[in-house]
Amino acid sequence: MPNSVGKRFKPTKYIPVSTAATLLVGSTTLFFVFTCPWLTKAVSPVVPLYNGIVFLFVLANFSMATFMDPGVFPRADEDEDKDDDFRAPLYKNVEIKGIQVRMKWCATCHFYRPPRCSHCSVCDNCVEEFDHHCPWVNNCIGRRNYRYFFLFLLSLSVHMVGVFSFGLLFVLHHLETLSALHTTVTLVVMCVTGLFFIPVMGLTGFHMVLVARGRTTNEQVTGKFRGGVNPFTRGCGGNVKHVLCSPLAPRYIADPRKKIPVTVTPPFLRPDLSNRHISVKVSDNGIHSNILRSKSKTSLNGMDDKSIDAQPPLPPKADRYNQIKSQLTSSEESSLSSKPTNPSTPAMFKYRPSFGTMPKVHYHATGEKIVMCENGNPSAVLEERSHDYRSEPNLDLPDYRSAPLHRTYQSSPFQLDSFSTTSRSFSLKQGVNRADCTPLGGTKHETITSTPHRGVFSPGTLSGRNSSLSYDSLLTPSVAPSIGECAAHPGVPSMGFHSPYLPTKMCHVRGPELQRHAGPPSYSPVHIGAMYGRQSPLSRERERDPSPVRYDNLSKTIMASIQERKEFEEREKLMHRHVQGYANDSGVFDTAYGLPHGYPDGPRGPASREPTPPVCASRDNLMGYPPRTPVLRSSASSLVRAPRTSTTSLHTDGGGMNRTAELQYRSPVHQSHQSPTSVPRSPSYAHQKVAFISALERADSPHLGTREDIGQGKVNGQLKGQYGTPSGTPSRHTSVKKVTGVGGTTYEISV
């Protein structure tokens, strides 16, 4: 009945309840009007009193069962069930007293029905401890009204028994007057009572069994707990007591006609605080301090935004030209300084190498002269490509194989140490042109080399051959087999190299150490040529694998140098023609240059005075270097020109090998009409990388001066005392051509 309020009126559903109420009230009324007066006189006045009390009890329970809320659960709101409606499973199991009970999802009310709850199809509500929907009371029988329904059945049964019994007593005393009104009304009441007595008594007996067993009509009909244990039973007495004497369950829905505003203060709501200062304890690396912070929302949000939007500062942008100026005036002292010169970088950059912050590359001053070999020989580029791919990146592309050698002088943090190049070029001329000459058997060769110190480059930390330009390979560069040791003479190490990522002095450590263990070194051209032995280009290419480069680790200067190489290609070709033309006009082959007079070591050994095998002409000997001594000048004109075979050249390919095998080296005068490809090509840079520090610079006494001090005593790789030596060839210094390279570096080329 209560659920009919606010809904559409349906008269059909009130027919059963109206019939039941009419029969109940009408039969009892007729009984009291026509039968009870005689029973009061004949039997006892208690009879009408008893029937009246029972009738009131029946009527009260009937009213309670009809109009009372059975225990309807409120439906879920739209915003409450929108997340669970489609994703929720149909059933969910819960454990009650160790027994699994299944709960079903209600698609109408949008929640899982509690145990013993069911959705009434007539009322369209989920009812707690749903028993059944009774049409005679027009209400669902649930937890809250089952007691009254059960008492109604009991009292109605008792009332019907009393009305039928007292009516039968009245009829038996009035058999001779059956046609009388009082007897006829009593017979009608007895018929109605008897007619409904059988179903009411049957229903009452059924519910008495359910109450005794602690079940509901729904559980009994659907067969729940039929083969198992009912977790909700309390025993017979406990079940009856629970039904008849338990407190009334609360109501879950409010009466729509009564909307009572209730002010609820949940305990989890905190009172509003004023804008007072709150002491906040901040832990900063073990130091605790109290900071007064404003509790305002704007200040807190500002702190959050600041912490979120704050990004680590970017590393300083490298200025190529400013770094060149600073590198010209700096020395190894800044590299060996105890104070770090690198700026503080954030965590995301501190594991990446910083390029250009430490002066590891020294460029030429304008007063120094650079003599370059400009013959367009692809072999020079081949050796340039094999330039220590472990200490700095190999950036030569295959289509640049024909580019001249001076591309290595581009302005880049990874470029060569040009001072060391000029100071050791004369020693390379002696060694490279004599690589295939047979060394003297009993002579012990001594090489003045700058090998990385054991503490700096340990074998365990060296990277592999195919290592990329990573941070580990930059700090611990390894030495390739072809670089650290001569292939023709495995026991003789070649000149060391200077890694651009470590100071020069770190590589000078073992120079005095080698001088202590070795005797006086011999400076015979034969020994130097054997010390710098050569390999065939095929074996060198097979031995060397291309080194992958991680371009994301390269600096901006290196990436710019790659783009600028194409621009210099045309300029190099023009320079190549001019230099080659002047070189062909030269007439003297300087082949046996010795070391300067000021070299600190002792005189040459006797081995240097033995007969010198035939040597090959080199274009490096044609450019920029006067003969050192009159002895060497006189011996240069008496040398025998021997043919160079293809096995002594590192730079010949398939067709070039056959041509050079048949070609004899002649004077540049006789070769002036030959094509540029047939000109003998200098292997001065064939085996040693141009970045190697010269033997002259590394063979000094343990007292190491700065690079600037050494550079002031040398011009074009010679000492100042020898710079004024008259040239053996008048046409050697006919003109000087200035070339400006990348980064403002000026090169003077003697042609």
Swiss-Prot record:
The chain crosses the membrane at residues 14-34, 42-62, 149-169, 186-206. It comes from Danio rerio. The gene is zdhhc8b. The DHHC domain is required for palmitoyltransferase activity. Residues 35-41, 170-185 are extracellular. It holds the Pfam family DHHC. It is found in: Golgi apparatus membrane; Mitochondrion membrane. Its EC number is 2.3.1.225. Palmitoyltransferase that catalyzes the addition of palmitate onto various protein substrates and therefore function in several unrelated biological processes. The active site is at 134 (s-palmitoyl cysteine intermediate). Residues 326-338 have a biased composition (Low complexity). Keywords: Acyltransferase, Golgi apparatus, Lipoprotein, Membrane, Mitochondrion, Palmitate, Transferase, Transmembrane, Transmembrane helix. GO terms for cellular component: Golgi apparatus; Golgi membrane; mitochondrial membrane. One of its GO terms (molecular function) is protein-cysteine S-palmitoyltransferase activity. This is Palmitoyltransferase ZDHHC8B. Residues 104-154 form the DHHC domain. GO terms for biological process: peptidyl-L-cysteine S-palmitoylation; positive regulation of cholesterol efflux. Residues 293-346, 437-461, 633-659, 666-685, 703-736 are annotated as: Disordered. It is an enzyme of class 2 (transferase). Residues 633-651, 669-681, 724-733 have a biased composition (Polar residues). It is a multi-pass membrane protein. It catalyses: L-cysteinyl-[protein] + hexadecanoyl-CoA = S-hexadecanoyl-L-cysteinyl-[protein] + CoA. Belongs to the DHHC palmitoyltransferase family. ERF2/ZDHHC9 subfamily. Residues 1-13, 63-148, 207-751 are cytoplasmic.
